[in-house]
Structures are given as C-alpha cells and as structure tokens.
C-alpha cells in the first residue's frame, strides 16, 4: 500500500448461513469494505437467500468448495461448536487464513491440532473474541497498566443469557454444546487476558456446574474459581438458562476497581464505572460494534503486518482452561465430531 491508496479488501468465504454471521462478518465487512466472495450451507436454498440478502458474490455447493475456492483467502467459520475444529483444520490445510467463532475447537486436543497445523502452514488463526478489540476492554487493561487501580486483587466475570430453544445445537453434547463452551469461554478468556498484570495466566482452583435437564453431560451453568500466580483470585460464571442478559466484568485492585457493564457486547451498554478513593465516575467508551474493530484488526494484520493480540496458541490455552473447568466440575470435555461430510453434516462424535 502506498500513499493514500486503501488496502486491498479481504476476500472472505463464509461457512453456513448462521444468524451470527450477519452480525459478526456481514455488517463489519460493509463498514470496512471487505468482500464476501462465497458462501455455502447444508441447504443451498438457505445459502442463496443469505447471499441475496447480504450481498455475497457467489453461492457454492459445499463447505469444502468454499475452503478450496482460489478466490477465498480468509475462511469465516460460524458453524455449530463441534464443526469449528474440523472445518478450521480443513481451511488451514487449504492454506487459508481462519477467523473462527469461539470456541475454536471441541476440546484442547483438537485445538492443539489446529495450532500445530496453522503454525506449519504459516496462516493466521484468529478465534473470534471480538470484545478484546473494543475500547471498553482496552480501557480496563489501561487502568491496570497505568497503575490507577493498583495491584490486581480480584476479577469477576459473569456471562448470563436466557435459555435457547431446546433444539438449539448449543444444548447438543455431540456438537460440543454447553454453557461453558458458549459463554464461559468469554469469562475465562477475559481472565486470561489480565495475565500481564497478575503474574501470569490463571489456573482453576475449583468449579461447580449444573446439567441441563434431559441433556446428559451438557452444562446449563458453571462457576469456576481461579487463581493467578501473583495472588489475585477470580470468579468466572456462566449460565445459559438465566433471567435476562448479564455480561459484566469487574476488576478490583488495591487502589480501586472498575466494572464494564457489558464487556462482551458494549453496543448494548458501553459504560465503565471506575471507583477510586476520591469518588466514582462513569466513562462511555462507544457503541461501535466489537466485530467491526475485530475485522479491521485482521485486515491490518494481513495487509500491513500489524500484530494481533491473540493467535492459535491463545486459542489452545483457552480450550485447555475450558477442559480444566469441566474436569473440576465433574463433567467430561466435549467430544469431537469424528466425520464431517462435504456439506458439513457431522458423523458420530468420537
């Protein structure tokens, strides 16, 4: 790129016609000017409707065709949790960069395979923790980095949503469902991102969880107690059958504390409340979508070499912490899908 010439648009291929795609990739691409060059879904009619509604350039017959399409340089994967790992690996094998919805895999073993493959292929692997790119989270980190809150002592992150429909794949063990996979991944990731001010990443001390009625092995809620090397403690809570929506992050230091009212989706509430000995103030950090910041960061990385704050190693570390929470709470880590057809239909879990 020279002078004022804008960077070349990213060429993005979309796997599936999931609802999240409109929020997480379609709207951001409209803002950034990046191209949605191809989409495929298990039902071609759904893919055609998605393309017509959202301006995707071409409809292909299968996920495999999207991954292999020479026009696609970035594969966006918003499929059900259990299909993240297999199709991320397929995209990496085709030398495509990957932007995957979280969690990046069904378990740490699968995440390690993706990390190793991405490293060997030299491709970018970004797990979609979009909140990390927003000024709300950057402000929380800044308050610790500048010492305004003092030494980190306590972190509390709550992720709560009302229950999805009974047939939602987030309740399917075979598709790597559960509250910790859908919501707790944020709670744990937010803790892990505080490692620079906590002496290192946290470990699980204890965890408790409740099983969804009629869904053996699937957690409806899970609370994890964490501890950092520097002595700070944490509470990572998630509930996928709660009352209302709550996505708060509270950071407590020995000089003060700060709470983000909705760190995961600040478009809904961008307040950060800072409490210090001299009083309390509320800062509004802006409701621009987190997903737009994320796509801008990915483009800056791929076009200009700007660093990203997370990579495939981070995705593996987060899955390792998720698996540790499951073990501590008496659950098994999620099984992986053993076979996936060209259109993305799962085989029996392995």
Regions found by a protein language model. Give the residues of each.
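C-terminal helix-rich "cap/oligomerization" subdomain common to oxidoreductases
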Residues: 1-9, 74-76, 229, 300-350
């Amino acid at each position: 790129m020279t002078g004022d010439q804008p960077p070349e648009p990213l060429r993005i291929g979309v796997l599936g016609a999931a609802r999240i795609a409109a929020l997480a990739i379609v709207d951001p691409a409209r803002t950034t000017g990046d191209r949605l060059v191809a989409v495929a879904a298990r039902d071609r009619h759904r893919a055609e409707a998605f393309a017509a509604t959202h301006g995707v350039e071409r409809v292909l017959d299968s996920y495999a065709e999207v991954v292999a399409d020479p026009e696609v340089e970035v594969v966006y994967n918003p499929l059900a949790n259990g299909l993240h790992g297999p199709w991320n690996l397929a995209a990496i094998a085709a030398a495509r960069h990957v932007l995957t919805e979280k969690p990046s895999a069904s378990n740490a073993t699968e995440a390690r395979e993706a990390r190793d493959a991405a490293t060997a292929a030299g491709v970018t692997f970004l797990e979609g923790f979009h909140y990390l790119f927003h000024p709300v989270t950057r402000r929380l980190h800044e308050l610790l980095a500048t010492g305004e809150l003092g030494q980190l002592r306590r972190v509390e992150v709550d992720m709560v949503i009302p229950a999805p429909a009974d047939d939602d794949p987030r309740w399917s063990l075979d598709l790597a469902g559960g509250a910790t996979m859908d919501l707790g991944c944020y709670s744990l990731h937010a803790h892990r991102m505080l490692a620079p001010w906590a002496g290192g990443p946290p470990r699980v001390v204890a965890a408790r969880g409740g099983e969804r009625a009629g869904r053996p092995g699937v957690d409806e809620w899970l609370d994890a107690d964490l501890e950092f090397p520097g002595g700070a403690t944490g509470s990572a809570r998630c509930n996928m059958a709660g009352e209302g929506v709550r996505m708060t992050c509270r950071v407590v230091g020995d000089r003060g504390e700060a709470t983000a009212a909705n760190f995961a989706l600040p478009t809904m509430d961008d307040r950060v409340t800072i409490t210090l000995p001299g009083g309390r103030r509320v800062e509004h950090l802006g409701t621009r979508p987190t997903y737009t910041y994320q796509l801008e960061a990915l483009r800056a990385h791929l076009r200009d070499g700007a660093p990203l704050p997370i990579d495939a190693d981070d995705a593996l570390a987060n899955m390792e912490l998720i698996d540790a929470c499951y073990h501590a709470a008496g659950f098994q880590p999620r099984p992986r899908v053993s076979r996936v057809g060209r259109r993305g239909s799962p085989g029996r879990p392995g």
